């Protein structure tokens, strides 16, 4: 290796190695490529005292340590730690300019999230800051957050725009996300969310802003190939169901599948709009009744719940238990953002799901892995420890049982993170 560039290229090559002495390996013999739903969400097969072979950055094979083959291939000793799939966080806003702890204090003093937004805080506050932040500054701060969530165990993440709310600022955000895609081994999907809030210059003219998104922003985003999805915040005080459907329809014409922020604050019609236009997922879902469950049961749309938003804003939690028992597929995500969920730690999301939404630990892990992968369209290559999927997994400390992960909500149980066959 004659030069630094040669050394760097060598280190970036996906490796071939064994993980040995695994206390418990959560492996997917079936090769799941569809979300688990209903009763199947509690099924999480494993083998004990195992080895796992990673070959050229992908999962190759596994078996019992009692049958470990003689080999010259290098091995990493898990020392009885468990191996589980890396988290798949399908809903984040981790590209942003500045934190909003002043609004945190305002809520302590009695203001609601909606009242803060009406006073120019919330999403508008973030948008005004972002417009005055350079692309490089945005990239540098977002890269720090990306490295942080990788160390928490996240191996695939969806990142939304939506703090620009004008053409140049939305493009700036999406270009940052594009740069992040090649910065680490974490798999990233980008989501165009100009319909996050109506900016001040369009106050009282939501229809005009929607037309601006459709006619001016969307063609440019597609021309530059900056987005994998299109999104709308369909809720009370934000975008109407009618305008949500207009944006989803326009996105479909450009080949962008929809995702929706729906029913966080009220029964908004967002779920029905998502089902009507074949959205990949509808997210939040704090306000869900029989009509929404029925609509989702007759669709291919995944329900993504975001319990840390309910925790941080003191909102009701999504009725996850009711939704799973009805037969729906659920995914869990962080909603990592500066205003309503300033954390990207997926293990805490599992704890909230179990404590506040009565999800079983096995259901929570599936919701945060294979179902999360499905909710951002990466399930063919990520989300489970299956042959020929990319080797994204975690090695934990030795555990007594799976329930200890959500139970010990303040502990960092992850010893090693492996993404695409590379130790992080």
Enumerate the predicted regions with their spans:
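Metal-associated gating/positioning segment near the N- to mid-region
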Residues: 78-141
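Active-site-adjacent C-terminal substructures of enzyme catalytic domains
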Residues: 257, 267-382, 396-400, 409, ...
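Metal-coordinating catalytic core of metallo-dependent amide/deamination hydrolases
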Residues: 126-141, 147, 155-268
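Alpha-helical segments flanking ligand/cofactor-binding loops in enzyme cores
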Residues: 85, 147, 245, 249, ...
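C-terminal cap of metal-dependent C-N hydrolases
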Residues: 36-41, 368-370, 390-424
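Conserved beta-strand scaffold positions in the cores of enzyme catalytic domains, especially
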Residues: 18, 24, 73-77, 190, ...
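Divalent metal-coordination and catalytic microenvironments
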Residues: 22, 52, 57, 80, ...
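N-terminal metal-binding scaffold of metallo-dependent hydrolase/deaminase domains
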Residues: 4-70
């Amino acid at each position: 290796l004659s030069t630094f560039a040669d050394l760097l290229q060598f280190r970036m090559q996906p490796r071939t190695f064994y993980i040995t002495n695994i206390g418990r390996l959560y492996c997917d013999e079936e090769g799941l490529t569809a979300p688990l739903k209903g009763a199947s969400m509690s099924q999480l097969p494993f083998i004990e005292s195992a080895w796992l072979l990673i070959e050229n950055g992908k999962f190759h094979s596994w078996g019992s340590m009692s049958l470990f083959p003689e080999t010259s291939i290098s091995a990493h000793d898990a020392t009885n730690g468990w191996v589980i799939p890396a988290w798949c966080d399908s809903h984040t806003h981790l590209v942003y300019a500045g934190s909003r702890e002043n609004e945190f204090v305002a809520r302590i003093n009695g203001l609601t999230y909606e009242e803060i937004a009406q006073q120019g805080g919330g999403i508008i506050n973030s948008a005004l800051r972002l417009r005055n932040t350079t692309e490089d500054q945005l990239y540098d701060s977002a890269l720090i957050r990306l490295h942080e969530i990788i160390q928490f165990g996240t191996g695939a993440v969806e990142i939304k725009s939506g703090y620009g709310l004008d053409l140049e600022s939305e493009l700036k955000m999406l270009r940052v996300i594009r740069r992040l895609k090649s910065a680490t081994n974490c798999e990233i999907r980008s989501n165009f969310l100009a319909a996050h809030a109506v900016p001040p210059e369009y106050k009282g003219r939501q229809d005009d802003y929607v037309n601006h998104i459709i006619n001016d922003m969307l063609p440019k985003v597609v021309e530059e190939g900056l987005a994998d999805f299109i999104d709308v915040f369909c809720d009370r005080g934000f975008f109407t169901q009618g305008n949500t459907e207009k944006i989803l329809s326009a996105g479909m014409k450009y080949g962008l599948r929809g995702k929706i922020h729906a029913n966080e604050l009220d029964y908004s019609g967002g779920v029905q709009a998502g089902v009507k236009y074949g959205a990949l997922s509808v997210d939040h879902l704090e306000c869900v009744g029989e009509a929404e469950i029925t609509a989702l049961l007759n669709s291919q749309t995944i329900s993504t719940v975001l319990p840390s938003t309910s925790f941080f804003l003191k909102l009701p939690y999504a009725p996850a238990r009711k939704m799973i028992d009805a037969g729906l597929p659920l995914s869990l995500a962080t909603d990592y953002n500066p205003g309503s969920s300033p954390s990207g730690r997926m293990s805490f999301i599992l704890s909230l799901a179990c404590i506040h939404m009565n999800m079983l630990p096995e259901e929570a892990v599936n919701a945060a892995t294979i179902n999360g992968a499905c909710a951002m369209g990466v399930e063919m290559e990520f989300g489970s420890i299956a042959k020929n999927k990319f080797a994204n997994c975690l090695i934990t400390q030795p555990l007594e049982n799976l329930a200890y992960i959500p139970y010990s909500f303040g502990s960092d149980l992850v010893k090693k993170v492996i993404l695409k066959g590379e130790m992080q």
